[in-house]
Amino acid sequence: MGVKLQAVQSLQALDVELFRFVNERLANPFFDVVMPFASGNVFFVPLVLATGILLVWKGRVRGLVCVLMLALVLPLGDGLIYRTIKHAVGRPRPFLTLTEVRRPGGKNDAKARPPPSTAQPNGRPPASGSGSMPSAHAANWFAATMIAFIYYRRSIRFMLPLALLVSFSRIYNGVHYPSDVVAGAALGAGYAAAAVWLLAALWGSSGRKWFPILWARLPSLLDPTLHPAPGSSEVGHLAEDTRHELQ
């Protein structure tokens, strides 16, 4: 037991040291502007919406299936899995427990000390706040990266750098430890791959029974290929088949 406890304490100390390195030693005026922006939604929400529209328009059935997977998998993971784990682990964020934490773009741009009223006696984050482990930002971005990679292999060239940038920004901004980000990335990528596989398997087994016409045209959600009738678009024909099945 003593050896295990010592190992855990060593890992925690390493986690704090890595956090300090990113949050303090890598600090510079350029990152102080870029990293809060990378963690925010001002740019990324319109980008995601525009990308979704472009995928449906240009990607035809493959793009439509990819967007549907993103719309199904990401909200479920963020609202149920990640938040449940955050509450169960109850790890306070770095700026709540460590001194001299930089929070660029936050309420305190200078080095901040943890407010005495924010942490509960048991060390858990306040009820109105959000825990540190895992990072939902990292989980969501790596989940999106995994789903995009499943349907578009070349997307890894720009999705992975974006996911890494957002994840790094969470440490730099003082709101997550490195282990929070690593755990979130692994959880998000693994959960997304499993969810896509499960939904595809469910479609393969139940689609044949409940939507035979649509299933005959689109038997696989992992490699979505539709053979439309002459003179009709793939997405348009898929929508027509769906309406027919639901009538």
Model-identified regions with their sequence ranges:
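Membrane-helix interface segments
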Residues: 30, 59-65, 151-158
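Alpha-helical transmembrane segments in multi-pass membrane proteins
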Residues: 69, 73-78, 82, 86, ...
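Membrane-embedded catalytic cores of phosphoryl/pyrophosphoryl-handling enzymes
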Residues: 115-247
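Transmembrane helix-bundle signature of multi-pass membrane transporters/permeases
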Residues: 71, 102-105, 163, 185-186
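Interfacial segments of alpha-helical transmembrane regions
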Residues: 48, 52-81
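N-terminal transmembrane-helix/juxtamembrane module of multi-pass inner/ER membrane proteins
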Residues: 1-47, 81-127, 243-247
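Membrane-interface elements of multi-pass transporters and channels
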Residues: 25, 29, 57, 83, ...
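Alpha-helical transmembrane segments of integral membrane proteins
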Residues: 35, 65-73, 155-158, 179-183
